[in-house]
Amino acid sequence: MSRLQDVVVNEMKVKKQIDSVEEIQEIKQFIKAYVKSHSFIQTLVLGISGGQDSTLTGKLAQLAVNELKEEGRNCKFIAVKLPYGVQQDAHEVEDALEFINPDTTYTVNIKPAVDQSVQSLSEAGIKLTDFQKGNEKARERMKVQFSIASNTQGIVLGTDHSAENITGFYTKYGDGAADIAPIFGLNKRQGKQLLAYLGAPKHLYEKVPTADLEDDKPQLPDEEALGVSYHDIDDYLEGKEIPATARETIEKHYVRNAHKRELAYTRYSWPKYNK
């Protein structure tokens, strides 16, 4: 293992193997402890895309909320459907919701807000690329979730896991923004393992992962966008040796996107990068 890989593995907290029962219990306890330590929390809010990460996070959140209710805490889980117009895989969102069985579900179409934002910027002389418009979608989705959380005295859950965090494969202050990230510490294959244990429909965790943010490249696979497979990313996070080209790609993503894993820099934090 290279020196940088050792640093990354320690930072990303991925275990070489997990016990499904123990991991699920640990994540539920984390969610419950956070809620119990903040008396204002009445809701947990999460956008559901129909993909592996939001399905897993949503299911664990609902299970934690169910236990909190049994313990006398008044709270609920709110799932949010956030299509941009008509979502191609809308049926998978419905399948995920049926599996999660959330207390409450809202639907907010982000298309009018995103299109208006793009138009307003264009009128100001700022022409967004399709990729940049994709980031607008991610930020609008998170804005909606925080608005719902604010309106219901809640918090927003993030779906960031370690295989995503290491590459910075999320929009800064978009899907990367949240109050808590319950599934951080898992890699992609471990997330699949937990969903399989929980009895999720196979197609929800066996589908090709995609952020699906770009109009010009609908359903673009994550692995194609990243230039590396989740198999190699997962192996890297577990401290295994992987092909040199894959390792170099992962480490380039890690270094280039370090700013996404930091809070806003100040004049007191910046000097550490000049040592």
Curated annotation (Swiss-Prot):
Its EC number is 6.3.1.5. InterPro entries: NAD/GMP_synthase, NAD_synthase, NH(3)-dep_NAD(+)_synth, Rossmann-like_a/b/a_fold. Deamido-NAD(+) binds at residues 139, 172, 179, 259-260. It is an enzyme of class 6 (ligase). ATP binds at residues 47-54, 159, 188, 210. It comes from the Bacteria. Coiled coil: none annotated. It catalyses: deamido-NAD(+) + NH4(+) + ATP = AMP + diphosphate + NAD(+) + H(+). GO terms for biological process: NAD biosynthetic process. Pathway: Cofactor biosynthesis; NAD(+) biosynthesis; NAD(+) from deamido-NAD(+) (ammonia route): step 1/1. One of its GO terms (molecular function) is ATP binding. The keyword ATP-binding applies. CDD domains: NAD_synthase. GO terms for cellular component: cytoplasm. Keywords: ATP-binding, Ligase, Magnesium, Metal-binding, NAD, Nucleotide-binding. Disulfide bonds: none annotated. Mg(2+) binds at residues 53, 164. Belongs to the NAD synthetase family. NCBIfam families: nadE (TIGR00552), PRK00768.1 (NF001979). Homodimer. Catalyzes the ATP-dependent amidation of deamido-NAD to form NAD. Uses ammonia as a nitrogen source. This is NH(3)-dependent NAD(+) synthetase.
